[in-house]
Amino acid sequence: MKLSKEISAFCDRIGHRFDRPELLVRALTHASRSTAGRSDNQRLEFLGDRVLGLVMAEALLEADPQAREGQLAPRYNALVRKETCAEVAREIGLGDVLRLGRSEMLTGGRRKDALLGDGMEAVIAAVYRDAGFEAAKALILRLWGKRIGAVEADARDPKTALQEWAQARGLPPPAYIESARSGPDHAPVFTISARLETGACAEAQAGSKRQAEQAAAKALLAQVESNHD
């Protein structure tokens, strides 16, 4: 199978040449594009999630031999969660080569965390199936390397951390309100306000509601923690 120039360039970016290029094509094919004769990337995404998890668990153990399980778990979760996979996918331009159906094309599928994260995991599995575990491990460590060393000991996602902060003080969970939406349908920008019962609030913008909520939660958490220092 001959790959397009765009997908060949993507291979260069991730540093892997496929002996079985059909694996990569499948990894890049979303369910909205699949047909009866051509499968999508869901099965590869399932496998890639497990390969990523094993590599991250081992990398964290090696990076901090003295860390306890309770310290490792939040770091691990921060490294393998869908938002992180989507961030890595954006860094390597994976969205540019995703094979999407018309419905996803019209609704900005190339920018969605869910599609990018799933695609990243599917690409990991494609490398694993093409060249084995060591090749997949090398890819993951190359793409995630800076994150492994920088991940915080308290690496809960901001929404979880903010909710736990509120609960510890007898407050109800924070509310997230979409205050504005701008941009075209294929590239929307969401403005989300995170608010506590105390009246404290913070606002953030992002290309998806999930990203905007996380960013608003992070800003509000920093605000309330600073005020209570």
UniProtKB/Swiss-Prot annotation:
E.C. number: 3.1.26.3
Cofactors that this protein relies on: Mg(2+)
Domain DRBM span(s) in chain numbering: 157-226
GO biological process: mRNA processing; regulation of gene expression; rRNA processing; tRNA processing
GO molecular function, one term: metal ion binding
Keywords assigned: Cytoplasm, Endonuclease, Hydrolase, Magnesium, Metal-binding, mRNA processing, Nuclease, RNA-binding, rRNA processing, rRNA-binding, tRNA processing
Location of the active site: D49, E121
Top-level taxon of the source organism: Bacteria
Reaction it catalyzes: Endonucleolytic cleavage to 5'-phosphomonoester
Localization (cell): Cytoplasm
InterPro entries linked: dsRBD_dom, RNase_III, RNase_III_dom, RNase_III_sf
Subunit structure: Homodimer.
Similarity comment: Belongs to the ribonuclease III family.
Protein name per the record: Ribonuclease 3
Organism: Dinoroseobacter shibae (strain DSM 16493 / NCIMB 14021 / DFL 12)
Name of the coding gene: rnc
